[in-house]
A protein has these predicted regions:
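"A position-specific structural signal for the A-helix of alpha-solenoid helical repeats
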Residues: 64, 97, 135, 166-173, ...
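Short coil/linker segments at helix-helix boundaries
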Residues: 220-250, 276-312, 316
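Generic helix N-cap/helix-start motif at coil->alpha-helix transitions
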Residues: 54-62, 88-97, 125-135, 163-171, ...
């Protein structure tokens, strides 16, 4: 039987697996060069009913259709094929693939339920169980349940046979969860230490996930520097520019890593940061030491600067949409960027 754990586990049988070194977005980015038209000779017979179509497919063909539709971003259709496959062969690998497809759809609640169900299976090998626990922790973090995710990661980290790169993957995951759980300094320390230790076996997806968390921290810190005090406006604008610039540098690294999921998430945050700065500049009060004429000039200049910054943020939205199309990646972040890019 073909093992359907291509996206996240390393390409060995599940008894020999390891913590995931590939991203769930690999399923989407494999379609970068050409969009796959997921059809075969069975779909040419348009007179076939749906039941007849599925009956005509062998187990091997169903597996192939699941993978084709997944690679082309047709997750609902992939799930339809997978449901038929599970009815024919109730295999844990297929249930894993089902959970993964829900992750790709960003339906994290459904993915979490399925990972939980798999973990109740008595026949899981220790390594396969560890993989599922890890994915479950990632999904919990994506649902905003970072304290629960940290508990899961701690359980995984107790395994005696973890390889060095698996420990690094876990440290990245824990650092990210710490940040989103509000333990920012601890999370940053973990991520920075892991960046110094990582190797080629660690996997680009988890590094990109960690860098996206750093972008979140940088943007959050920049937004705390408001322009309410006129005397500090110039100083705070400079500091915010530096923080946003540091966030941009992290995004460039993620682009080079080839991880669109986290690039797009970060571009949403970055564009929102620009819009926030622009909005605050429009309402920032002029220094009280200026006379009326100087205040008018100050406000006019602030409005011009705000318009420029606003346009800069919108340009990042448009670039994100273009990058998403180039990479063949779909998701909520892409939709948000598209809405932003098309706003007047």
């Amino acid at each position: 039987m073909i093992i359907l754990m291509m996206c996240l586990l390393m390409p060995q049988a599940k008894s020999e697996g390891a913590l995931p070194t590939e991203t769930r977005s690999d399923a989407e980015t494999s379609v970068r060069a050409n969009s796959i038209n997921a059809t075969n000779e069975h779909t040419d017979d348009m007179h076939l009913t749906e039941a007849q179509y599925f009956d005509a497919l062998s187990v091997l063909e169903l597996e192939e259709m699941v993978q084709l539709r997944k690679r082309s971003g047709q997750y609902d259709d992939a799930l339809r094929h997978l449901t038929i496959l599970i009815k024919r062969v109730d295999d844990l690998d297929y249930h894993y693939e089902e959970a993964l497809l829900y992750e790709l759809k960003e339906d994290y609640a459904q993915a979490a339920q399925r990972y939980e169900a798999i973990l109740t299976a008595p026949e899981l090998s220790p390594v396969f169980r560890r993989n599922i626990q890890f994915r479950y922790g990632i999904v919990l973090s994506d649902m905003g349940l970072d304290r629960d995710a940290l508990a899961v990661f701690r359980t995984v980290s107790r395994a005696k046979d973890l390889k060095s790169h698996e420990k690094l993957i876990l440290e990245y995951a824990r650092g990210v969860a710490y940040i989103y759980a509000g333990k920012t300094r601890k999370g940053i320390r973990k991520i920075n230490k892991t960046l110094l230790k990582q190797n080629s076996d660690t996997g680009s997806w988890i590094e990109a996930r960690a860098r996206a968390a750093l972008v979140y921290v940088l943007i959050e810190e920049s937004e705390r520097l408001t322009f309410e005090k006129p005397k500090k406006t110039a100083q705070r604008f400079q500091k915010r520019s530096e923080l946003v610039g540091a966030a941009e540098e992290q995004i460039v690294v993620m682009i080079n890593l080839g991880e669109p999921e986290y690039v797009l998430r970060s571009l949403v945050l970055l564009s929102e940061a620009y819009f926030q700065v622009a909005e605050e500049m429009r309402v920032a009060p002029p220094p009280p030491t200026l006379n009326r004429e100087q205040q008018i000039r100050f406000q006019k200049k602030q409005l011009e600067r705000a318009d420029f910054i606003d346009e800069r943020g919108r340009s990042y939205c448009a670039k994100g949409v273009g990058y998403s199309d180039q990479m063949g990646f779909k998701g909520q972040a892409r939709l948000e960027l598209e809405v932003c890019a098309n706003e007047e």
